[in-house]
């Protein structure tokens, strides 16, 4: 079970990461829906899940590369908004849970 502080951190990142993405110039990622954040090792690492149902496999790879390039900008926006001294290292992954649930419904 996760500690309450870790859950708060994840919840805060769920709000701040889409705000940071919306300020970027890349049209593929500035309105990307973030579906979840999973913090590991305290606040040192965070896996950020996004909904890529609108993209094919090649476009998902491009989106992940764009997110990797924008990682520093996202981290600086999160740091400015929170006042933390350290921001987690973000790893972006496609959320496959939505696709699995659609298959179950069909």
Annotate each PLM feature.
Residues 1-106:
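Charge-rich, low-complexity N-terminal segments
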């Amino acid at each position: 079970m996760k500690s309450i502080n870790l859950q708060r951190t994840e919840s805060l990142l769920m709000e701040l990461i889409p705000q940071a993405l919306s300020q970027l110039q890349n049209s593929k990622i500035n309105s990307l829906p973030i579906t979840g954040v999973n913090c590991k090792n305290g606040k040192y690492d965070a896996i950020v899940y996004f909904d890529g149902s609108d993209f094919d496999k090649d476009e998902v790879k491009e989106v992940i590369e764009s997110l990797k390039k924008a990682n520093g900008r996202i981290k600086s926006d999160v740091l400015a908004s929170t006042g933390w001294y350290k921001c987690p290292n973000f790893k972006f992954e496609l959320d496959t849970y939505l696709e699995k649930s659609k298959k179950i419904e069909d």
